[in-house]
Amino acid sequence: MTNERKEVSEAPVNFGANLGLMLDLYDDFLQDPSSVPEDLQVLFSTIKNDDSIVPALKSTSSQNSDGTIKRVMRLIDNIRQYGHLKADIYPVNPPKRKHVPKLEIEDFDLDQQTLEGISAGIVSDHFADIYDNAYEAILRMEKRYKGPIAFEYTHINNNTERGWLKRRIETPYKVTLNNNEKRALFKQLAYVEGFEKYLHKNFVGAKRFSIEGVDALVPMLQRTITIAAKEGIKNIQIGMAHRGRLNVLTHVLEKPYEMMISEFMHTDPMKFLPEDGSLQLTAGWTGDVKYHLGGIKTTDSYGTMQRIALANNPSHLEIVAPVVEGRTRAAQDDTQRAGAPTTDHHKAMPIIIHGDAAYPGQGINFETMNLGNLKGYSTGGSLHIITNNRIGFTTEPIDARSTTYSTDVAKGYDVPIFHVNADDVEATIEAIDIAMEFRKEFHKDVVIDLVGYRRFGHNEMDEPSITNPVPYQNIRKHDSVEYVFGKKLVNEGVISEDEMHSFIEQVQKELRQAHDKINKADKMDNPDMEKPAELALPLQADEQSFTFDHLKEINDALLTYPDGFNILKKLNKVLEKRHEPFNKEDGLVDWAQAEQLAFATILQDGTPIRLTGQDSERGTFSHRHAVLHDEQTGETYTPLHHVPDQKATFDIHNSPLSEAAVVGFEYGYNVENKKSFNIWEAQYGDFANMSQMIFDNFLFSSRSKWGERSGLTLFLPHAYEGQGPEHSSARLERFLQLAAENNCTVVNLSSSSNYFHLLRAQAASLDSEQMRPLVVMSPKSLLRNKTVAKPIDEFTSGGFEPILTESYQADKVTKVILATGKMFIDLKEALAKNPDESVLLVAIERLYPFPEEEIEALLAQLPNLEEVSWVQEEPKNQGAWLYVYPYVKVLVADKYDLSYHGRIQRAAPAEGDGEIHKLVQNKIIENALKNN
């Protein structure tokens, strides 16, 4: 007889109120085993010949609905579902539970003798081979579910996942650490706590955001990375806030003590950077506080050569989560091939460390977890660790959340949650083991709630007893985990008392030696760094030329589909018009076609493209059609996967209805794979401000703070077209306010060919010192405007132009109008109806860096110029006016009059009524074109 058993779903184990049905099914099973589901066959086979079970089942008839077996099943079900409420997971200050479900044998009118007469198989199908009876099995369950790890998994909908977790948790298993491993674990804790104690003593009051109280985080990370190494995962991406960050840097990424202590002493830490190049640390010219900085360590300390990255992070809690997910996905994707990328979730894994107050408090966590199983964003399962010190600055849980646990919000994503006592180090290791096994099996997220405390205040200058006096009376008396575990090992005979204290002192000795080296080092005379020379210049134009035949070959390939592929007739007519620029003299390339041609040539150059956003496959305004759908079968076809001589991948995904997490993901992806042309497209530019934290704290400042380069491109539909205040403005002014030190390029274009050349220039800058973010105020109605569309000869040569003008007679021009984007096109079309040679329209295609030299050179050619006007659609306090005014004021000096035409100052971006919009828009154009 074999001991192998098939998985049993949760339902048969928890039949409870369905007991009558189960009895009927059992009778059917006795007549014909194949007449019941397979999982019930397994369960019923364990009790078929058991004299204690069958009579017990039969005794629970409709006349005795509260019979013995039903009560046993209710007890078992309660232990599984609610045992966590009585688990030993609080090192100090356990909460007082007001309402705890029945969890004891006596609560169900059961006793030892009754349970000893029932098969263990009724508790769990695999227990029949392990325990003699239900009493022994229930004792095991009580110990398991009420121990130092509290398990929550019954909320998971997937039967297979629930069954796997049930079996893994309930099967007798204990992390077996031999004496050497226990000794090593103690040493890890001694280093963790010794580091904190040394800093606390020698740098009194200095902010370090101590890990003390959740010290086990470091051995948990070390265990995770070791398991990952055994699985062949060679890229680890970690994201965390400031709490415990310095300890993780020193003991997980192996940043030398000398470097860390140097930062406290304001000396140059780079003098102690390992010469072997194994530790990569970047820095910007303005810098950041030490507990925001990350790094990358290449090491074989965990069993195989691995790349361990800790992401740079601002003080904005949790916002790094999607960045880490994006970095992980980039490490998993193979983009150096034609077609779509292939994703290997085995290449890399993300570890995201949260705070207990911030995890339920910050919505970015829910946006990020929602990405977990999506085709374009999945990373094969993230390990989430909550460093739960049960306080947020001064705020206690009762004021921080509306749920029992900070992790309750994760239940909606069908992931297992393990709460573990931070003082039981061996239990924390077991929690990691189970989590990593589950991730490997199901490629899904796991949440571990590391329940501890905070030894000191929010920072080391803070006095927590002012606001939290009672908890801190107990915390001050509570022994550290280093001491708790050390004494346990002494009692077990693993180490002696002298060995314990000797090793603690050895750690302090190593830290003193490191400190002594720094005392001899020179103070930093000038800590300021200079910007890279490449950033002194704007984005450089890509001057590569193309033959007509080359672009035609690409265009033909993009308009060729598989045999039998049925495109909607209405759409096919639109796509067929893309042949016209190549076979008609008056054929023009519109915006969407210009983009397709640019993308194709970029792919031929070997640069992968990733484009995401809400509705990006089709395009919000039904212009792109990058992914085609067979109208009969629903199958899809992506022409940009089939470009002739394609050397890199094209990846496009409709994103979930999220901005912050999706933009953070794309930023992280591009930081990890700097060769990738990452583009995020807003559904409307108005919604981009949902990602403001990513813009402010990462995209536009990361290089200045951290030396972290990104070339992420933003497509933000922007134009005033009578659609109201929430569908008109991408808040151009905010991006221009963020622009400084050549940290980005901001454009608002009026020409499809200039768009083509811009995209190529941005792609060419990637993975170079030139790379920087690109912000495109992309068009809406202009997508189909013939004035914007250009002939093919403007694509075969030339490059991006920061300003554009029409032909003009210099001596006749008395007025220059500077405008951008749709405003320029509106003015151009109005002027075409009433030509006036005295007015010269100038399209400012690139707003930042502002094209001063180009405008100055143009104005110098106009001998009779009298007036320069800036014209915009936006209100005066918005748009580009306040940004361009200082530049233009210098250019006109006292030589010309300077005027503004646009909407007056407004609190909201645009009018809500379409007719009023037209009146205001027409008035702006009329006044601007008047020649005084």
Swiss-Prot record:
Keyword Endoplasmic reticulum attached: no
Kinase as UniProt keyword:
no
Q: What is its EC number?
A: 1.2.4.2
Record's Gene3D superfamilies? 3.40.50.12470, 3.40.50.970, Multifunctional 2-oxoglutarate metabolism enzyme, C-terminal domain (3.40.50.11610), TPP helical domain (1.10.287.1150)
Class of this enzyme: oxidoreductase
Q: Which UniProt keywords apply?
A: Glycolysis, Oxidoreductase, Thiamine pyrophosphate
Q: Which domain of life is it from?
A: Bacteria
Disulfide bond sites: none
Q: Which GO terms describe its cellular component?
A: cytosol; oxoglutarate dehydrogenase complex
Signal sequence extent? none
Q: Which SMART domains match?
A: Transket_pyr
SUPFAM superfamilies per UniProt: Thiamin diphosphate-binding fold (THDP-binding) (SSF52518)
Q: Which cofactor does it need?
A: thiamine diphosphate
Q: Which InterPro entries match?
A: 2oxoglutarate_DH_E1, 2oxoglutarate_DH_E1_bac, DH_E1, KGD_C_sf, ODO-1/KGD_C, THDP-binding, Transketolase-like_Pyr-bd
Pfam families noted in UniProt: E1_dh, OxoGdeHyase_C, Transket_pyr
Q: Enumerate the Gene Ontology biological process terms.
A: glycolytic process; tricarboxylic acid cycle
Q: Name one GO molecular function term.
A: thiamine pyrophosphate binding
Similarity annotation? Belongs to the alpha-ketoglutarate dehydrogenase family.
Provide the function of this protein.
Answer: E1 component of the 2-oxoglutarate dehydrogenase (OGDH) complex which catalyzes the decarboxylation of 2-oxoglutarate, the first step in the conversion of 2-oxoglutarate to succinyl-CoA and CO(2).
Subunit structure, as described in the record: Homodimer. Part of the 2-oxoglutarate dehydrogenase (OGDH) complex composed of E1 (2-oxoglutarate dehydrogenase), E2 (dihydrolipoamide succinyltransferase) and E3 (dihydrolipoamide dehydrogenase); the complex contains multiple copies of the three enzymatic components (E1, E2 and E3).
What's this protein's name?
2-oxoglutarate dehydrogenase E1 component
Q: Which organism is it from?
A: Staphylococcus aureus (strain JH9)
The primary gene name is odhA
